[in-house]
Amino acid sequence: MRLILIFLIGTLFCFAAPAAAFFPLSWDDLMFQMEKRMSWNRAKLETVVQVFDPFAKNADGEFSKIPVELPARSFKQVIHWKDGEILIVETQDEQGQLLHFYYENKDELLSISLNDNRTLETEDILPHQLRFRSRYEDDRSRALEETGIIYKAIAYHISDDNHVFLRIGDFESGHFALLNPKTYDLISIHNRLWLEDETWLELKIVFKNYETYRWQTYAKVTEYFLDNRLFKRTTVSKIRTLSRLPIKELQEQAWKLRHLQTATLQNNYAL
C-alpha cells in the first residue's frame, strides 16, 4: 500500500510539473526578478542612429525588399542616465550640431527641437530600454506606457516559430511587449499607429544583439519597423558606468536652451 501511494504521488508530481512550469509570473514577481538583475546606477551611452525609408519602391512600383537608407537623416546621441532620477539625451547630427535636447531631472522636464529643418519629437529620441531596465517599478511602467502599453497582464506567448516568451499587455489590441522568460531581457515592443482612415500601421521595436557590461545585459542594437519594414536602427557605440554625472553643466545647458527657444518645462510631469 505504501509503495502504491508513493507511486501515485510521484505520478501526480510529474504531471503537475509542466503545468507549474508554464504558469506565468504575477506582475509583482516579474518586477522583483527584474529589479534583481539591474546592476547599473549611473551610465553614459553613445549611440548611432540610421534612418531608412520604409515605403521606398523599386522600378516596378513594389516595396523594396532591401531597406533604403537615408544617410542625410541619420544622427547620433549622447545619453546621461541615473536610475530613477535623471535622463538627458543630446541628439546631434553627423557634424556634432545639436538637433534636440531632452532634459529630465526628477520633476523637471525640458524637451526641445533645435533645428527648424529637422524637427524631432520626444518619442523619436527616447532610449526605451534604459527606462525599462530601471530598478523602480514606476520607471518600468512608464517605459511601457510611453509605447502605448497600459494593460499589465502577463501571459506566455508562443511565436509562429514556436519560441516561448513572456508577454506584457493585451495581444488582441496589438499593444504588448515580449520578454525572454529566463533572463527577462526585453525582446520586442508592439504597438499600432492609427491613421485618419481608421486603418493602422503595425509598429514593432526589436531589441537584439545583447551584450553584458559590468554584470548588466543590454541590447546593442534596436530596430524599428512599420508593417515589418525597417525605418530606424539604433546601435550602441560606447557605454560606461559613472560614479557621478556632469549634472551641473547639463543643467546650465538646459536653462540656456530654454531661454533661447520656446520649450516645455513642467513640474510633476508625466509622459
Regions found by a protein language model. Give the residues of each.
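Gly/Pro-enriched, hydrophobic low-complexity segments
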Residues: 96, 157-253
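Flexible, processing/modification-adjacent segments and terminal tails
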Residues: 22-30, 39, 103-176, 196-199, ...
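Sec/Tat signal peptide C-region and signal peptidase I cleavage site
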Residues: 15-21
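N-terminal mature ectodomain segment of secretory-pathway/periplasmic proteins
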Residues: 22-116, 149-155
